[in-house]
Amino acid sequence: MLNPGEVHVWRVSLNRGKVRPATTEEALRAARFGTPTLRRRYLRAHAALRVILSGVTTAPLEFALHEKGKPYLASAPEIRFNLAHSRGLALVAVARDVEVGVDIERIRPLPEYAAIAQRYFPPGFDELTGVRDFFRHWTRFEALLKAHGSGLYGAGAAPPGAWSVTEVDAGPNFAAAVAVEGASPNVVIHGYGEEA
């Protein structure tokens, strides 16, 4: 299913369906969210991640963390994945043998977007045309940092090496992007659950 040069991205609705935590750690992490809605969305996103990964590898799902906190499959290190969610919609990106990062943001009013861009974006992002443009660039930049494994810890400069970033259609009120190590991939979009 995962061919070289492809990244598969699943759109996952987080607003319906019952889920239970798979591990004690997952339950403890979910409990830290401030509202029942946020806890349920977290659990649904991680349940979908497990189902999706079990569909691309027959190895048991044994998760571990890289030194900067990016999760990976210790049981199938050739499978690379990333998860992002915003306001009831998640994206799960999966690739083989290349690092991958994904980000999604619901487009919403954000009066301080220019100050945020100035603080976090690398030089050259001074020409934003509005909040929609800000979120397009934000998701591209965040996906790149997540693929690299640095997240906002690495903000202020693009990660070293060759990376490709592709925008993903997540719906009219969202901006989304996927980033991979190396050449621009063929992005294959899937629905999951009610998004199917």
For each feature predicted by the language model, list its residue ranges.
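Core catalytic alpha/beta fold that binds nucleotide/phospho-ligands
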Residues: 1-196
